Amino acid sequence: MCIRDRTAEIAVKASITGHLVVSTLHTNSSANTITRLADMGVENYLIADSVVGVIAQRLVRRVCPACGIVREATAGEKKILGIKDPTRRINVRTPGHKECVRCGGTGYYGRIGIYEIMPVTADLRQAINRGENADVLEEIALTHGMKTLRMSAIDYALRGITLSLIHI
């Protein structure tokens, strides 16, 4: 089910009564999902009591494994990847040959999901009850080990799977 304003509170109340509710909500991050529910009129205490976790996801293009070219990252790519030392050697895989049979010459073969998984911990529940903004919620989640979408994309870039950081 995709949550809309008028059904958000019904979904939250159903989860409080023991029903497993799995839904979609279009936001830019896991933390923004919490604040979006509040913006829809769901009370903070209901959100804190009902949400056990949030997963944000994006699909990014996968560099073709058959023709992708491994090369050293440019200074700009290193900056995007968060590499502070510009002299550090970092390899990335970029789209390859136009004659590739596997990808039809596009340099990309399929898509792969990147994920941000935010379990709602006790600290996060308290922050939700206080009505904290998405930035504060994300900081709390990060202290409990959450990886952001950007961190996930960087991990895939360093492993040579994608270079689609611009979309994150």
Describe the function of each predicted region.
Residues 4-165:
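Short, flexible helix-loop junctions that flank or precede catalytic/ligand sites
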